[in-house]
Amino acid sequence: MPSRNALWTWIKLLGLALAVLDLALVTAQSNSPQTCPPASDISPCVCQVKKNGLDILCEATDVQHITKAMSALKGKSPIIFYLKLRHNNLPKLQGFVFLALDIRHLTIHNSSLATIEETSLSSLGRGLTQLDVSQNQLSSVPSSALKNLHYLLILNLNHNRISQIHNRAFEGLDTLEILTIYENKLTLIEPDAFRGLDKKLKRLNLGGNDLTAVPQKALSMLDNLRKLELQENRIKTIKEGDFEGLENLDSLILAHNQLTEVPARVFFHLTLLNSLELEGNSISYIAKEAFEGLEENLQYLRLGDNNLHIIPSDALRPLHRLRHLDLRSNNISVISEDAFVGFGDSITFLNLQKNDIKVLPALVFENLNSLETLSIQNNKLTRIPEEVMEPIMDSLRVVDIMDNPLVCSCELVWFPNLLRELKNRDDEMLQKKRPMCTMPNEHREYYVQNMPLERMNCVGKKYHTSSLSGNGAPCKVTLMTSLLSFVTGTALIGHGRFR
């Protein structure tokens, strides 16, 4: 008769064996090949087998056919990785319609959906990670239907008719990381609207609505938010404290609102902000302390399509990490020689196109020793002297000065010669954008590379000598001229330097 110890050992081994067997059965079930049901059972829906499960599309049908297709899928334990209901007549999502189904990504798009019953999604709480109900007729957040989706990561409510977000509208969505409510009719967001989203929410899109002010109280609890989109609203003013509580914000988009000024310290709490978009407003004034608090991290600043008449240098000077500065499509007519002093040494991209700039001061680019891309096309420049461009030629890779009223001159001879030397390079932009200049005496336009050099008495004069690396390495071009040279087109100038 076996001893007590031997018996216990045998029982433990048996238990271990059963546990291993159970694990094997679970693994086998999860790894078992997924199969679509017969096409006739789910028609007009169609099914495909994908790597992670079934991909089912129900398009241009109605609630009866969708309900029939869902019933055919029940009891077979498939993983439905994508269920896409698009362009259907589905005004109401019935309760328990997805009961006993394992759905990971659910899309109900452009299907006239106006009502989501409380029990319609309740069975999906442990599996659903993405829900897209965009382009429908929802007039409010379907809070009761969402509250059990405890593993949801992404919720898309774009293009509906939601006008208000009530308190605790997203309660239960503890794991939500992305919430997008773009192009609705939002006018009011209650103070506790986002209660419960503070743990995980990283991105919030409230763009394309009718908000007239920043919903500060509702936003202040989202201390883990990384990206906030408020573009295309009717926000007229922003003030200090509007963004308090958003200390981890990396990107803020306020483009295409109705702002007329940027007041002092308005972004003071956003010390980690990397990107700020203010284009498409009517901004004519930026306070000297407007960007206080952003000194250490702001790298991308977009101020295009506003009403600025000067470069706001005083406000920009503290931004010593700024890399990308976009000032296109303003009303800037004069640039001071010290416009970029104090902050220009880190800028790699500068866009000044579509302004009214007539003259570039000799030392205006003196501090831009990291500049790689310069866009000054579509201004009113007649001359761009070599002395202006010389400080940035070591770093410059792209320069675009198309659509300026340049005057044909012997000073431009270096440019067509440079183009010929670069002709073997695959430069699509260079081929599409060929600069032009006007011959004063003839009142005629020429492509710069086709200027009549003999009639201009330019032949025989030394304008440049050059050497180019044969292996496509950065080129070095030396200009030998007593005249000032013009940069007259768009060229990729890999580390080129003009002397």
Task: Kindly label every feature range from the protein language model.
Residues P2-R499:
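Extracellular leucine-rich repeat
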